[in-house]
Design a protein with these regions (language model features):
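Membrane-embedded alpha-helical bundles of multi-pass transporters/translocases
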Residues: 2-457
Length: 457
């Protein structure tokens, strides 16, 4: 008698070029998720002299637009009859529009305060729209390329691997260029162009390399946003999973928005953001295979529990940087980085399994509808993270300035920076565990990574 789950292997393996080429798209998703969250709020408050609360709104509102545009892009992609399939043409449209728009965000005319915030907000909104056109179909593709959960895991492995490369490159490159000439508008303009080149390489690479991917099984598009939300409510596992990841993405977004302030005002050097990112991303590359192995042996939900608890512990430890010195801060970020490796891989694996289970249970393919809602929630959470951190700055009396006139910060603002980087993300991550517990209790979700016996290679 064949082993349970062996029918998964009847699906043909994807060409290696497709798996690797698909992963290239994460050079876009990782970069666009990292650089605005890391740089944009600081650029507004410390280069363009925008008050913290106004800067937070300029970062948050354009990304909040994704709550509307992402599900619409998902439905449009589901209904698409474009030549090249329902997904890849959207990848090409995004690749042609996002890189130049991103460069323009940091090419502001000589403005200060509210006018500068308005310029950045408009360009950021346009860039967020272009990103949605690329990201929603991109995230959908693994669930449609193959029925084999192990093959989906391989595809996602390349995606998350390139995600780590993107975060490392952009997280180190963008601040290094921006700070090279003393945080001047010119240095930020050069940084925007360099990051735009990285975006273009990943986006065009993913579009070209997935030409040989299997024809996507068309999802059924829900006719309206209300219908899409109703579809999501019909899938309890998806609701719990999306809620869990939204809280965790918010925690990551808050921490990401604060890391440049933490480097400048807690560690005492704007350039300290580079070793901080090395502590964060080094474990991402090294520990991702270990998280994948743990998921195979113990189950993906068990591994997600471990990653979530470790992230919470690392965030709590970060609060003791002032008392213990920079070494404590760097050690805490290493723990967060180890956890972050799992949080980048495991929720995506759980999402792909949940989408496949929904299709098998309902007989309907709603992958793009669900991923549109997923990416909208994720993007909103990351954007809200910057907005929440900006509110912490405003509430604690942070003083904005331009590149030529730096100012000293009050003690309350320095305390707020540390708390916003540590205590607040820890609370959000702890709250996500309740939803993860509910997801684990949902009987309709099966995890083939855990249930299928190991096979010899």
């Amino acid at each position: 008698m064949p082993a349970a789950g062996s029918d998964h292997h009847a699906a043909p393996l994807l060409p290696r070029t497709v798996r690797i080429g698909y992963g290239l798209g994460s050079l876009c998703t990782g970069t666009f998720a990292t650089v605005p969250g890391l740089i944009l709020l600081y650029y507004l408050t410390n280069v363009l002299a925008v008050p913290a609360a106004v800067a937070g709104a300029a970062v948050f509102l354009p990304k909040a637009w994704d709550v509307l545009i992402n599900p619409l892009v998902g439905a449009l992609s589901d209904r698409s009859r474009l030549r090249g399939g329902p997904r890849r043409p959207f990848l090409l449209i995004g690749a042609c529009t996002l890189p130049p728009l991103f460069a323009l965000i940091f090419a502001a005319p000589p403005l200060r305060g509210a006018p500068a915030a308005a310029y950045v907000a408009v360009l950021f909104l346009l860039a967020a729209t272009a990103y949605a056109v690329f990201q929603v179909p991109y995230v959908t593709m693994p669930a449609e390329m193959t029925e084999d959960p192990h093959e989906r895991g391989r595809v996602l492995g390349w995606r998350v691997g390139f995600l780590g490369v993107a975060i490392l490159l952009s997280g180190a490159l963008a601040p290094a260029i921006a700070h090279a000439d003393g945080d001047t508008p010119e240095s930020y303009r050069l940084m925007g162009v360099a990051v735009a080149v990285l975006l273009a390489f990943g986006m065009f690479g993913a579009w070209a390399a997935t030409r040989r991917a299997p024809e996507a099984a068309r999802s059924e598009a829900e006719p309206s946003l209300r219908a899409q939300l109703a579809a999501a409510r019909s899938s309890t596992p998806f609701l719990y999973l999306a809620g869990m990841w939204t809280l965790q993405a918010l925690a990551i977004g808050v921490m990401l928005a604060g890391v440049q302030y933490f480097a400048t005002y807690t560690l005492g050097s704007a350039g300290a953001v580079t070793p901080l990112f090395a502590c964060l991303i080094g474990p991402l590359v090294l520990f991702m295979p270990l998280w994948n192995r743990l998921a195979r042996r113990k189950g993906v939900t068990y591994a997600q529990w471990c990653a979530s608890l470790l992230y919470t512990a690392g965030a709590v430890l970060l609060a003791f940087t002032g008392a213990g010195g920079p070494a404590v801060g760097y050690a805490a970020v290493v723990l967060v980085g180890i956890a972050y490796a799992g949080l980048q891989l495991l929720p995506l694996t759980m999402l792909a399994d949940t989408l496949a289970a929904d299709a098998a249970t309902t007989g309907r393919r709603r992958a793009a509808t669900f991923t549109g809602l997923w990416t909208a929630a994720e993007t909103l959470a990351f954007a809200l993270g910057a907005g929440v951190f900006a509110l912490v700055l405003a509430a604690t009396g942070f003083r904005s300035s331009d590149a030529a006139h730096q100012v000293d910060q009050p003690d309350a603002a320095l305390t707020g920076i540390t708390a916003g980087m540590s205590v607040l993300p820890a609370v959000l991550a702890a709250a996500s565990l309740l939803l993860l517990h509910r997801y684990r209790e949902t009987p309709t979700v099966s995890h083939p990574l855990q249930e299928e016996p190991a096979r010899a290679d």
